[in-house]
């Protein structure tokens, strides 16, 4: 839910909000000569006021994705002279201390004013919004280092304490102090114990006349049952892992690599900042370098950080090195490591955002990075799992084992709590070769606990309730059957069918389930012709791709195929842009863009997509038309000023994104779809889904000739 944000200059005695782009007027020193006019035109210094980490801490966690563009025209050949004791050029250490003292004095005054206001009014205060920046630097390419012109440069800065100063070259004079304030939100107060999207503490953003400076501030999306949306939850986890050192720790006489303490995780989660940056030549002037940066900031109180860490444990993203499970995340004294599932999620986040930090790459290259997760399809509006029969059958094939059952020789080994057998996600649930159930000896049986363990460790489920729901659907669709109930376990109200995630509940694969997973010969496909939703025969690759994209089960298989083919970014971009444009048209229809905050937030999302998929050298750079790429670059790097021009800019960006989406659609339909339909690994499954008429002729094609698929890689990592 977007928050209301207003920007207005403050008078000398006005109390600043908890987040301010603070730009004090220069104070001439009696001992320092005034700077020359030429020097003042060449450069200026912006000093940010150090602020406390949370002047008004209500215990609300926050998450915000911000993006902005600031144009600063500095002649490439201009050099800035130095003046001792002056704010122009290089500043001596003594004067830095004087600026810090001035900053502290102004901060103390601001906090005093805040306190006086708090004693005379009932209105509540929250942390307010800040913004990232996209800066356009007027420097020649010859003046840049190799790292600057090499393309996408991700930034993973250390945690910010909310204080500090920055220096920014600009030809513009200082502007009046501006503040961002936020109105209290009653809904937020009712959701005090949920993760919330609010702004970061401080960003040192210079203000210039030609700028696009937007702030994105919104509540973190929550589901009906008060859990964060899966994508946001995984992004929060991955950002935390990138911020940690993940070095070696010793426990008694054992050394554990790539680990972290519970205290480090809680402290870092209290204030996280992730930035991704992209440098490229200006399409209109190659001698200028344009830098686009998207900043995401998470912030929350200590107890909430502890609760979120426990959610990471419950989702099997991290685990204690001693293998012991605790229902409450310890404040200190415990050592944790990423699970294979957590490493896989971190890897996908790093590939999308181009993260190449050495300590993260070491984890991704470690022997523990073996998992191939089943990426479950979710509803974009509610985040609920797709639960149609076809999608559940796709999940079931991996659950049961595509190459046969994962049989253990004894009941004790099949029922053990060890999860090492699931380290790669390519084998099915652990089954006992023979088990006595009542008076019968049954083959290939498994427990209810083994089923939910596999679903939690080998798929993108994030809480146990989702695993039970999927297992219930296995029973409902006749894929598994119960052989022995756990009578000591109470029945769950409002459940679809009875499924018990217990060690004492015994289940087996039905005959239909064995046919679905390929253990038994399939029935002969029906000789029918199917049509798409518009009644048009699917006689073209475009229509075939439309059918695949509209079917969650086929879309899941198609994504897996593209991942093995090293071009999954095409489908990811298509789906992400579909969500973005759908939201845009929905807001536009109801007049939501009359609010400047909605425009700024939507533009921030647009820059996130652009930096990930479309900017030159981005980690998941797409293969699109050169002219379209230049049009996108020109539009995304153009400075705008007032709210009307930002809305016009957003409209143009949406049109260009839709053109890029069409280009990617044509690429997938002409190149990927024919190969997907001819792949022998999927041909039998496609027949089972009544899409046998989609399968084209010609030789078979498979990007994965071996049993173990090649890992997904972003385009920037391919050689």
Curated annotation (Swiss-Prot):
InterPro entries (UniProt xref): DEP_dom, RGS, RGS_sf, RGS_subdomain_2, WH-like_DNA-bd_sf, WH_DNA-bd_sf
Swiss-Prot/TrEMBL keywords: Signal transduction inhibitor
Keyword Disulfide bond found: no
Ranges for region Fungal-DR: 214-411
Keyword Iron-sulfur: no
Biased composition (Polar residues): 1-17
One GO process term, biological-process aspect: positive regulation of sterigmatocystin biosynthetic process
Domain RGS: 540-685
Source organism, top-level taxon: Eukaryota
Disordered as annotated region, ranges: 1-39, 117-141, 155-190, 694-719
Composition skew (Low complexity), residue ranges: 123-135, 158-171
Domain DEP: 425-511
Domain remark in the UniProt entry: The fungal-differentiation regulator (Fungal-DR) domain is only found in fungal regulator of G-protein signaling (RGS) proteins that regulate differentiation pathways. It is required for function.
Function description: Required for asexual sporulation and normal colony development. May be involved in brlA activation. Could play a regulatory role in controlling the flug-initiated signal transduction pathway that triggers the asexual reproduction.
Protein name, as recorded: Developmental regulator flbA
Record organism: Emericella nidulans (strain FGSC A4 / ATCC 38163 / CBS 112.46 / NRRL 194 / M139)
Originating gene: flbA
């Amino acid at each position: 839910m977007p928050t209301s944000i207003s920007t207005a200059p403050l008078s000398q005695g006005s109390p600043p909000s908890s987040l301010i782009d603070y730009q004090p007027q220069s104070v001439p020193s009696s001992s320092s000569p005034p700077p020359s006019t030429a020097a003042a035109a060449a450069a200026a210094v912006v000093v940010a006021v150090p602020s406390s980490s949370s002047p008004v801490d209500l215990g609300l966690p926050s998450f915000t994705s911000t993006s902005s563009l600031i144009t600063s025209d500095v002649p490439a050949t201009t050099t800035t002279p130095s003046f001792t004791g002056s704010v122009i050029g290089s500043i001596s250490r003594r004067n830095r201390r004087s600026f810090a003292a001035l900053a502290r004095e102004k901060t103390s005054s601001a906090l005093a004013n805040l306190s006086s206001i708090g004693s005379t009014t009932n209105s509540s205060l929250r942390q307010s919004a800040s913004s990232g920046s996209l800066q356009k630097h007027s420097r020649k390419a010859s003046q840049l280092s190799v790292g600057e012109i090499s393309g996408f440069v991700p930034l993973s800065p250390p945690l910010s304490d909310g204080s500090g100063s920055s220096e920014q070259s600009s030809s513009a004079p200082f502007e009046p102090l501006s503040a961002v304030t936020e109105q209290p939100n009653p809904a937020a107060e009712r959701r005090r114990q949920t993760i919330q999207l609010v702004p970061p503490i401080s960003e040192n953003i210079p203000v210039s006349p030609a700028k696009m400076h937007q702030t994105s501030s919104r509540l973190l999306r929550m589901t009906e049952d008060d859990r964060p949306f899966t994508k946001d939850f995984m992004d929060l986890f991955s950002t935390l892992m990138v911020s940690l050192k993940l070095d070696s720790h010793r426990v008694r006489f054992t050394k554990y690599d790539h680990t972290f303490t519970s205290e480090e995780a809680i402290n870092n989660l209290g204030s996280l900042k992730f930035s991704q940056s992209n440098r490229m030549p200006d399409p209109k002037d190659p001698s200028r370098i344009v830098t686009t940066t998207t900043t995401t900031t998470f912030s929350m109180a200590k107890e909430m950080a502890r609760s979120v860490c426990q959610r990471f444990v419950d989702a099997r993203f991290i685990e204690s090195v001693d293998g012991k499970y605790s229902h409450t995340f310890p404040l200190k004294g415990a050592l944790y490591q990423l699970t294979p599932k957590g490493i896989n999620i971190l890897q996908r986040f790093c590939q999308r955002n181009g993260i190449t930090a050495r300590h993260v790459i070491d984890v991704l290259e470690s022997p523990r990075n073996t998992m191939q997760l089943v990426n479950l399809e979710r509803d974009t509006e509610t985040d609920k799992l797709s639960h149609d029969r076809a999608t559940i059958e796709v999940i079931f094939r991996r659950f049961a084992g595509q190459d046969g059952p994962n049989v253990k020789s004894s009941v004790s080994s099949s029922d053990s709590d060890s999860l090492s057998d699931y380290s790669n996600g390519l084998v099915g649930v652990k089954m006992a070769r023979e088990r006595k159930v009542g008076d019968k000896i049954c083959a290939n049986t498994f427990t209810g606990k083994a089923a939910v363990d596999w679903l939690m460790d080998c798929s993108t489920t994030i809480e146990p309730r989702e695993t039970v729901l999927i297992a219930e659907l296995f029973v409902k669709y006749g894929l598994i059957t119960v052989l022995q109930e756990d009578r000591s376990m109470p029945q769950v109200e409002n459940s679809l069918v009875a499924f018990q995630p217990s060690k004492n509940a015994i289940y087996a694969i039905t005959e239909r389930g064995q046919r679905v997973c390929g253990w038994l010969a399939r029935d002969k496909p029906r000789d029918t012709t199917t049509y798409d939703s518009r009644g048009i025969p699917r006689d073209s690759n475009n229509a075939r791709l439309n059918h695949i994209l509209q079917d969650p089960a086929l879309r899941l298989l198609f994504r897996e195929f593209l991942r093995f083919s090293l071009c999954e970014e095409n489908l990811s971009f298509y789906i992400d842009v579909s969500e973005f444009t759908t939201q845009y048209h929905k807001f536009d229809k109801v007049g939501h863009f009359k609010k400047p905050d909605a425009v700024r937030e939507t533009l921030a999302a647009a820059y996130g997509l652009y930096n990930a998929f479309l900017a030159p050298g981005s980690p998941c750079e797409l293969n699109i038309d050169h002219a379209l790429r230049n049009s996108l670059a020109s539009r995304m790097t153009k400075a705008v000023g007032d709210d009307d021009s930002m809305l016009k800019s957003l409209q143009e960006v949406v049109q260009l994104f839709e053109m890029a989406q069409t280009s990617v659609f044509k690429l997938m339909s002409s190149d990927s779809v024919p190969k997907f339909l001819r792949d022998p690994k999927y041909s039998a499954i496609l027949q089972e889904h009544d899409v046998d008429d989609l399968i084209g002729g010609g030789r078979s094609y498979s990007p994965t000739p071996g049993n173990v698929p090649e890992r997904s890689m972003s385009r920037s990592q391919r050689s």
